[in-house]
Amino acid sequence: HENSSAASDVYKRQDREQIMYYKEDKKGIILEEGINEAGAMSAWLALATSYSTHQQAMIPFYIFYSMFGFQRIGDLAWASGDSQARGFLIGATAGRTTLNGEGLQHQDGHSHILANTIPNCKSYDATYAYELAVIIQDGLERMYGKKENFFYYITTMNENYNHPSIPDGVEQGIIAGVYKVDSIKLTKNKKKSINVNLMGAGTILHEVIAASKILADDYSITSDIWSLTSINELVRDGQEIDRWNMLNPEKNKKMAYIERILEDSNGPFVIATDYMKAYGEQLRKYIPDDLHVLGTDGFGRSDSRETLRNFFEVDRYFIVIATLNILAQQDKISANELKRAIKTFDIDVDKLNPLIL
């Protein structure tokens, strides 16, 4: 072989015929680390701190199974925060139910909870490509334009679904952590109905949308659909506002971002994510009406996505049941209507809690 140079490859690579061949290029490089999370994270950390150690900023992306991120190399992630790293961690195949067939070891239901323990890690659970683009653009501006010492953790899925074009004016909400995706109304010949707020994140947002259509078609219940791009960012903002209000009692109270966005909302709330209930429960204080949280507590299972979401009780039918339950508690519908829905969806009321299985 000839020697390599800083300019580019100047030698013939023996693995050139492979898909993931080794390549050096001024425009960037891909390191295929294999099953070596500690080594890969160390490489990312070296690049993420190069702005300081070498006075040359790099923009590293480390893509990995989300279960094998913070859970496996948590101390290195903490060191990344301590070292003021800048870069992107991409938790692929994220969520408890999106990675069907790989069971307990691979299915992640808590990486966002772990990410939130690192003060300068900003974490997002994106559903659509336009959300991902907005988040990455914001990260590039903050880390490399304004030179702020954050790093980003973004979860992505391996599930195929349609990605719509970006709606007008949603960028601020995506970055802050929540925005309205749609409002589901009834046909004109139907009377004024009950309204609810359905909030979803990541791949489970599609189950939320499907549930909203069932509620409209079968129960004459309208809904506002919200994408929760970052529960953690919303909670941090809320806690910052709480602190300010506590320390400034003589001044007018401020409102958290999510409180301002939901101030004029109508009806109770259901939050459904592909993560443990504790993730969504963080928002309870800032929700202006009754709230029911669905999540994927328990160990993973090997099965289809449809079966997994039913098992963990986060599919469209459990979202409908949770909605009807909260409406029954508010005396807006009868308990019998809830009971009929449980029978209609063939839900086993004696089903064991997935947490204990």
Where are these predicted regions, by residue range?
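Single conserved hydrophobic/aromatic residue that forms the stacking wall/gate
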Residues: 1-7, 11
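Conserved phosphate/anionic-ligand binding catalytic regions in large, soluble enzymes, centered on
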Residues: 33-51, 319
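Active-site nucleophile and cofactor-binding loops and adjacent substrate-binding regions
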Residues: 22-41, 62-70, 91-94, 100, ...
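A glycine-rich helix N-cap at a beta->alpha junction
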Residues: 79-95
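A short, small-residue-rich loop immediately preceding and capping a beta-strand
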Residues: 54-67, 88-91, 198-200
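Active-site-adjacent bridging/hinge elements
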Residues: 9-25, 293-295
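Hydrophobic, small-residue-rich alpha-helical packing segments that form membrane-like cores
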Residues: 111-118, 128
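Thiamine diphosphate
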Residues: 19, 53-55, 97-106, 116, ...
